[in-house]
A protein has these predicted regions:
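A residue-level marker of the well-folded mature domains of exported/periplasmic proteins
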Residues: 1-168
């Protein structure tokens, strides 16, 4: 358990619609850990890339050697954090978002420090977009402008269900 642990957030702030989703992920994480004994000791912008995630994580673990976990708003930056931590021989757990094929491959390794990725089904997202577009093209108003697409965790307990798929 990671109770009373130091954590780090790898985020991607900005004003594009994609970044709005990233900001929501970060805020959801912060809301969830509030009052539960976690101390966010660092937050950094990895620009959603493996390269930046790796470089900055290397610097962060030097300055904060007691970090126990990194939450990354996407798997690309999470994979960079994973690479830096693996190279440094640090057992710091990484949690990402997207269900990226690369992340799933390392989650599948025995005792991987990349513990989990949260995912949504791109197929479901595509179907919901199609339904909304079809409604708009027909000149009708959609019932809802926001559609909730459920997220789910991919970790060592269910990785076999998702490992062979590029995306869910």
């Amino acid at each position: 358990a990671l109770i009373s642990s130091s954590v780090c957030i790898c985020h991607d702030p900005g004003s594009s619609p994609a970044n709005n989703a990233c900001n929501d992920r970060e805020q959801g994480f912060l809301d969830t850990i509030e009052g539960k004994g976690f101390d966010v000791v660092a937050t950094f912008d990895a620009e959603g890339t493996v390269e930046k995630g790796q470089t900055i994580t290397s610097d962060i673990i030097q300055a904060n050697p007691d970090i126990k976990a990194i939450f990354s708003i996407n798997d690309q930056a999470g994979m960079g954090a994973y690479a830096a931590l693996t190279t440094a021989g640090k057992e710091v757990y990484v949690y990402g978002v997207d269900g990226a094929p690369e992340a799933k491959k390392v989650i599948a390794k025995d005792n991987s420090i990349y513990r989990m990725t949260a995912a949504q089904s791109p197929i479901t997202i595509g179907k919901e977009c199609y339904k909304a577009a079809k409604t708009l093209i027909a000149g009708e108003k959609p019932e809802e402008f926001e559609v909730d697409v459920p997220a789910f965790a991919i970790d060592s307990s269910n990785i076999d269900e998702y490992l062979d798929a590029d995306w869910q």
